């Protein structure tokens, strides 16, 4: 199970991520408002400015104070590390 740090010690499962987007556009703002009304919004910004909106496969919306590029980089870095670990395990066998 891959976990991604989304800032301030908050971690989400990488397997559940559908999209990581910027909160600037009107459609994303609408998605955030609808999630708030449905009780499906998780605010992980600790009162700071929202810089990334994470959409999960369970229709939860997670707000993060970390840039979308940073979250994506952490996701890609974690995947690369997992591949390297898998390769090393196969060599040991």
UniProtKB/Swiss-Prot annotation:
Give the residue ranges for region: Disordered.
Answer: 74-93
Pfam families from the xrefs? RemA-like (PF04025)
User: Could you tell me where the Acidic residues compositional bias lies?
Assistant: 81-93
Q: Which domain of life is it from?
A: Bacteria
HAMAP family from the UniProt entry: RemA
Q: Which family does it belong to?
A: Belongs to the RemA family.
The record's listing under PANTHER family reads: REGULATORY PROTEIN SSL2874-RELATED, REGULATORY PROTEIN TM_1690-RELATED
Protein name (database record): Putative regulatory protein Cthe_1316
Species assigned in the record: Acetivibrio thermocellus (strain ATCC 27405 / DSM 1237 / JCM 9322 / NBRC 103400 / NCIMB 10682 / NRRL B-4536 / VPI 7372) (Clostridium thermocellum)
